[in-house]
């Protein structure tokens, strides 16, 4: 175990954790002085709740009957403590990075807080990530452990784990929730655990966890969120959304996402003694039943899912009646869709424009419909510093479009172990270049107008075109390729692979089968495959994606489409 500082805490922000960029000392001091940072560690969100509301229901699974199942705050606290002792006994030590990849369920909460209590740094993988992404996360973070389910949504995670262990010698511990196969059983590990001594508290300025980016310029990057900044993120979001102990929050997006985790999400609900219900199935039929069963009052969706829910109200026998607040974010919600959502699901729509890297913008409860339907909100915190600049880095005029740059008390100062990316993604003053094009209205609300980076926004997920193109070009049947986003009624954008075949063509099903075997996550694979005789280029020889999109509007060549689930 690392030596403790004089106050009993583990090492200070850099803590020997190479690759972490801490907040500059002057800004950190100002955030503490202003009261944004409380000096709490993230695991105290649970311990404080267990002390204040021990008997209140903390978490439940969507299928649980009210009054049966779930865990009280005291029970969740005890399980996290026992599991932390088990992890320590296994050999996981403070500062270790552990890949956490569990589906939505109470076990996610137990595992998250157990890792925090053990002093480990969870790497928040999503259930849809596969070997390519997990291997990248393991390599960048030098992870020593992996926590997965045995099987979820029809996918067996154990063969993937075997592949990862073979390729990454630092992955010494694989813990499986369910049938462990050749690995360690979570249930047996915890059953055999003693009480153990708690890990010394972490420095609040050090990383509490690593979120994953949308992969806008290649493989997803790792986002260090400190204890100080993430406690503020969750607490301030809960206050802005007026969460109370009477609320029931439905975790319907993947729980490892920043949005349902801390905006206010699971963690924000805990700060006020509310209940979080985990829903593994976001379909309207399953989600509406969970909302009815548990009296859900708050949830968060991406636009594609919000539109599907709203449309489903026309035929589903059970529709949401208890929702007081529906957050929609992840990509832009168009005004006509916002009106439809407010009419069909709840008038309490809240648009959220944020990023796992930090900055959050919300429309406010009580904002007029025009603001809620036509803008993506304004910053969470008075200390959020925003710059909107043109292509030359110069500030734009009032109401003009430009790229959004930001820094503040909960925005990162650098991706983890990504020096080259950080040189490109931050300006000399430490402002993060978001890649989002926005304009700021006179009332302070932002309107998102597009992206600077070459990305596709599919169902709330950001996919780097360059990363997919690299995978496409690895197929021997493909001579050249371009990935473009095409408008889609339900997904926002669908992924289209425009390719020139080297010889005999392949089908979309064959291509996606190949990408699956390469470990490419399902949500990043093409929805549409278009064969072209040649890819159009600009005068300087670059592939002209705007021309591709224009041509696809009148394409009559062979086109094969298939939804990617």
Curated annotation (Swiss-Prot):
GO molecular function: acid-thiol ligase activity; ATP binding; nucleotidyltransferase activity
Keyword annotations from UniProtKB, A to Z: ATP-binding, Ligase, Nucleotide-binding, Transferase
Domain of life, per lineage: Bacteria
Activity control, per UniProt: Inhibited by salicyl-AMS, an acyl-AMP analog. Also inhibited by 5'-O-[(N-acyl)sulfamoyl]adenosines.
Pathway, per record: Siderophore biosynthesis; mycobactin biosynthesis
Record lineage: Bacteria, Bacillati, Actinomycetota, Actinomycetes, Mycobacteriales
Biological processes per GO annotation: cellular response to iron ion starvation; siderophore biosynthetic process
SUPFAM superfamilies membership: Acetyl-CoA synthetase-like
Alphabetical list of Pfam families matching this protein: AMP-binding, AMP-binding_C
Function per UniProt: Involved in the initial steps of the mycobactin biosynthetic pathway. Catalyzes the salicylation of the aryl carrier protein (ArCP) domain of MbtB through a two-step reaction. The first step is the ATP-dependent adenylation of salicylate to generate a salicyl-AMP intermediate. The second step is the transfer of this activated salicylate to MbtB to form a salicyl-ArCP domain thioester.
InterPro entries: AMP-bd_C (IPR025110), AMP-bd_C_sf (IPR045851), AMP-dep_synth/lig_dom (IPR000873), ANL_N_sf (IPR042099), ATP-dep_AMP-bd_enzyme (IPR050237)
The protein, known as: Salicyl-AMP ligase / salicyl-S-ArCP synthetase
